[in-house]
Regions:
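Conserved NAD+-utilizing ADP-ribose enzyme module
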Residues: 63-64, 134, 141
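A structural preference for long, well-packed, hydrophobic secondary-structure segments
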Residues: 97, 106, 122, 131-133, ...
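Well-ordered alpha/beta subsegment
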Residues: 138-163
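Short, internal acidic amphipathic alpha-helical interface segments
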Residues: 83-120
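Charge-rich, low-complexity N-terminal segments
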Residues: 1-58
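Beta-strand/loop substructures that line and gate deep hydrophobic ligand-binding cavities in soluble
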Residues: 116-138
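Helix-adjacent hinge/juxtasegments
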Residues: 58-91
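A short acidic, glycine/proline-enriched capping/turn motif at secondary-structure boundaries
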Residues: 73-74, 93-96, 133
């Protein structure tokens, strides 16, 4: 009888924190103004199998979109804590396919997770893992190059929202 095999290997990830000069509410509003939600027409077209319409929506979309936003602060309230924090999934479906066409496991990290929270000093902070360090683990320069492009795009929009 055969058994499933498991492979484990350590990876090194570069973690980034950006402390804002504005309040949590102002930074959240700025981010959501700069990065729109993912166009629901994309998912709807894919669900219907309408690849032409999905591609039209994808190609007219923004460089980055918010796939989801989770109010982690709401969850913390169940533990009796009051914290302002939102976890975002941010990315671009076309960018994701540039990587997954070469290395399907990159889908583990696309879209990217970004955490926005208010720290103890009352300042808003973004934290995320640098895309090129996540995607670099796959050892495919085509994927790592896309990760480096994402490094610049993500940092640029977060710094703009934070400032």
């Amino acid at each position: 009888m055969t058994h499933p095999s498991t492979v484990r290997r350590p990876i090194q990830v570069e973690h980034v924190a950006i402390e804002a000069t504005k309040s949590f509410e102002a930074v959240k509003a700025a981010l959501e103004a700069l990065v729109p939600p993912l166009d629901p027409a994309i998912s709807e077209a894919l669900r219907r199998g309408d690849i032409v319409r999905a591609n039209e929506a994808l190609y007219r979309g923004p460089e980055l979109a918010i796939f989801s936003a989770r109010d982690h602060g709401g969850l913390l309230r169940t533990a009796g804590l009051v914290r302002k924090t939102v976890q975002y999934e941010i990315g671009n479906p076309l960018t994701a396919t540039e990587m997954t066409r070469h290395q399907l496991p990159t889908a583990l990290y696309a879209p990217l997770r970004v955490l926005l929270y208010e720290n103890e000093a009352g300042r808003a902070v973004f934290e995320y893992d640098r895309p090129s360090s996540l995607f670099g683990q796959f050892g495919d320069e085509r994927v790592t190059a896309v990760g480096r492009e994402l490094d610049a795009k993500l940092e640029s929009v977060l710094v703009k929202a934070a400032g």
